[in-house]
Amino acid sequence: MLSSTLYAGLLCSLAAPAFGVVHEKLSAVPSGWTLVKDASESDTITLSVALARQNLDQLESKLTTLATPGNAEYGQWLDQSDIESLFPTASDDAVIQWLKDAGITQVSRQGSLVNFATTVGTANKLFDTKFSYYRNGASQKLRTTQYSIPDSLTNSIDLIAPTVFFGKEQESTLPSHAVKLPALPRRAATNSSCANLITPACLVEMYNLGDYKPDASSGSRVGFGSFLNESANYADLAIYEKLFNIPSQNFSVELINGGVNDQNWATASLGEANLDVELIVAVSHPLPVVEFITGGSPPFVPNVDEPTAADNQNEPYLEYYEYLLSKPNSKLPQVISNSYGDDEQTVPEYYARRVCNLIGLMGLRGITVLESSGDTGIGSACMSNDGTNTPQFTPTFPGTCPFITAVGGTQSYAPEVAWDGSSGGFSNYFSRPWYQYLAVEDYLDNHVTEDTKNYYSQYTNFRGRAFPDVSAHSLTPYYEVVLTGKHYKSGGTSAACPVFAGIVAMLNDARLRAGKSTLGFLNPLLYSILAEGFTDITAGASVGCDGINPQTGKPVPGGGIIPYAHWNATEGWDPVTGLGVPDFMKLKDLVLSL
């Protein structure tokens, strides 16, 4: 398990030497990444100082108060100004002065981030470190394995980024599960072929959407995040709508942190983004949809070279959530789907906790944040990166954040069973949250044998946050989608998440039309009143830790092999399908009763 331990150390700044502490330190370079060369001192680098937020020890209790049905304050969500009042950020005065003393003048503020540009030589001295270039496949990134900050700033700074977070390698322009289909005729709204391909009509049947018609003017809105140079395509959505007789609807786009909306089929990466928007529209049409395209490098810095495409592959969660939190509630969708994640242990713990707290603040504002649980089952790497090379199950972040709703996957049709690639398990960073204590205890007490628990306990943390929370169809049969004007079949939990987002958007639509608040942070409600609105999945299992990457089918170099590693789908909550798949009509009646 990766941890961010504090050590005593020496910080060298340009102004004067100062004693400091090693703030974050990796025991080893993350799996798959290799050192290419040390960066030249004249190379440019852009970094962000994440200022500490105060009173975060009260975040969970406030979420409990507002998100637990039956409480007097249930659903009385906060707005932007309330968050800034209750959870203010530390002053940036000392941080900016520290940067100025080092000769850094290109500085700007974005939410609780202080962004700056400098040379590698200055950054190396400022943080008592050595920035180098590392490569993983097509990705090359400028990173370090540890850095220090002055003692006097430890209460003001959460972390510096990007430093020790390597993220994932560059992804292909199509999702790993995408397979091209022959040209197909325009489809009538029929579910006769659902055993072969999943279409919008199939989703109506599978999740009991009935004849419910959302009102585009109700105020319910749905969003999705795009990273790694992805952008959804307007023309492809129009083709998809025509194919399935969906009335014409487009989506809006907001660019964050240098994101680019590339509508050129020849150059765009659109596989994931198209999957998101097409499935959201398939479920929740005509509710407004917005795509948040987040780039990987701050755009504010003058006279500094932009990073190359190969340097722009991390999911910049900090910039993403800081941007969202900077907007008033009236300018935000009430449910946001995200289909990107990393092995939890590859995300430095400071960074993971910072991002998770930002997601919690979103929940306080009545925003439901969803995350696909991942497509690697119990795990792919299955080897610790703390220097001990210990075999272990591999949970995925941000799905392990207790303030997010993680969406796992099912397969097959009528009935659905657990998908073997649905990621799930237990976090090594976050403890089990209050809302799922009883459900997870029931699973461990009644559906896992003592021998299995004893065997698995050396590979997983049964006291950690358990995920996923819910699930929806992922693969086999595939979803039918449109990419670059052509028909493809695709899927994964990256499909399950936007499907569930569309359903949450419709539940918000029903509540808003009834004069009620949006659902906001969903998990306390899911594990109590809404549990009966899900169809329990009790067949199938997830697998992994067999030395093969289930997304690519290729061997994992240095991957851990754990015999018999799997999670079974069981009655009640389980770490493959969570509470099960949604029954919209049941859920609608339940949320309207609150």
Which residues fall in each region the model found?
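Substrate-binding/charge-relay-adjacent region of secreted/lumenal peptidase catalytic domains
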Residues: 21-108, 115, 120-372, 376-406, ...
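Non-catalytic alpha/beta scaffold blocks inside enzyme catalytic domains
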Residues: 401-436
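Fungal secretory targeting signals
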Residues: 1-20, 280
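An often Trp-containing, charged/polar helix-loop segment at the C-terminal end
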Residues: 508-575
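Short glycine/serine- and small hydrophobic-enriched flexible loop segments
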Residues: 501-509
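Acidic/polar loop patches that form or flank catalytic/metal-binding clefts of enzymes
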Residues: 249-252, 370-371, 406-409, 414-420, ...
